[in-house]
C-alpha cells in the first residue's frame, strides 16, 4: 500500500486502527463484487478501498455502520412491551367472566427418563460428518 494513500486517509479517519478496519471491510466488499467508485488503475482491493476513503467517494460513517451490521449475529427488533395495567385488566376480565383456569398446571413436570433409556438414546445418535472447517 502506498504510504501517501494512508496519510491521505488519516485526514478522514483519525484513528489508524479504525481506518484499517474500514478499509479491510471495504476491500472484502469489493472482492465479493461490490462496485468501486473510482478508477482501479491496476491497484489491488485494499489500495482501491483506501483511495475511495481518501477521495471521500465513500463516507467513513456509512462504512462503519455497514461494518457493524456485517458483524452482528443477532439483530434485536424493538417490540413494544405489553402494558402491565392492560394485562392486569385482561386477567381480571377473564376471571370475572367465570372462565375456568384449571387448564394451567400449577407445577411444571418434566418427563422422567431412566439411565438405561438415556444411554440407549445416546448410542442411537449419529455422529456428524467431518468437514474441512476445522
Curated annotation (Swiss-Prot):
It is an enzyme of class 2 (transferase). This is DNA-directed RNA polymerase subunit omega. One of its GO terms (cellular component) is DNA-directed RNA polymerase complex. HAMAP family: RNApol_bact_RpoZ. It comes from the Bacteria. The gene is rpoZ. It comes from Rhizobium johnstonii (strain DSM 114642 / LMG 32736 / 3841) (Rhizobium leguminosarum bv. viciae). Pfam families: RNA_pol_Rpb6. NCBIfam families: rpoZ. Keywords: DNA-directed RNA polymerase, Nucleotidyltransferase, Transcription, Transferase. GO terms for molecular function: DNA binding; DNA-directed RNA polymerase activity. The keyword Transferase applies. The RNAP catalytic core consists of 2 alpha, 1 beta, 1 beta' and 1 omega subunit. When a sigma factor is associated with the core the holoenzyme is formed, which can initiate transcription. Belongs to the RNA polymerase subunit omega family. SMART domains: RNA_pol_Rpb6. GO terms for biological process: DNA-templated transcription. The keyword DNA damage does not apply. Promotes RNA polymerase assembly. Latches the N- and C-terminal regions of the beta' subunit thereby facilitating its interaction with the beta and alpha subunits. Its EC number is 2.7.7.6.
Amino acid at each position: 500500500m502506498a504510504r501517501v494513500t494512508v496519510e491521505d486517509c488519516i485526514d478522514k479517519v483519525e484513528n489508524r486502527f479504525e481506518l484499517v478496519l474500514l478499509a479491510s471491510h471495504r476491500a472484502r466488499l469489493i472482492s465479493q463484487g461490490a462496485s468501486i467508485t473510482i478508477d482501479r488503475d491496476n491497484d489491488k482491493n485494499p489500495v482501491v478501498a483506501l483511495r475511495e476513503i481518501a477521495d471521500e467517494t465513500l463516507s467513513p460513517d456509512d462504512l462503519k455502520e455497514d461494518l457493524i451490521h456485517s458483524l452482528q449475529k443477532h439483530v434485536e427488533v424493538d417490540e413494544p412491551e405489553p402494558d402491565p395495567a392492560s394485562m392486569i385488566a385482561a386477567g381480571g376480565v377473564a376471571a370475572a367472566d367465570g372462565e375456568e383456569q384449571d387448564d394451567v398446571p400449577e407445577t411444571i413436570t418434566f418427563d422422567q427418563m431412566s439411565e438405561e433409556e438415556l444411554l440407549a438414546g445416546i448410542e442411537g445418535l449419529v455422529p456428524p460428518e467431518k468437514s474441512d472447517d476445522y
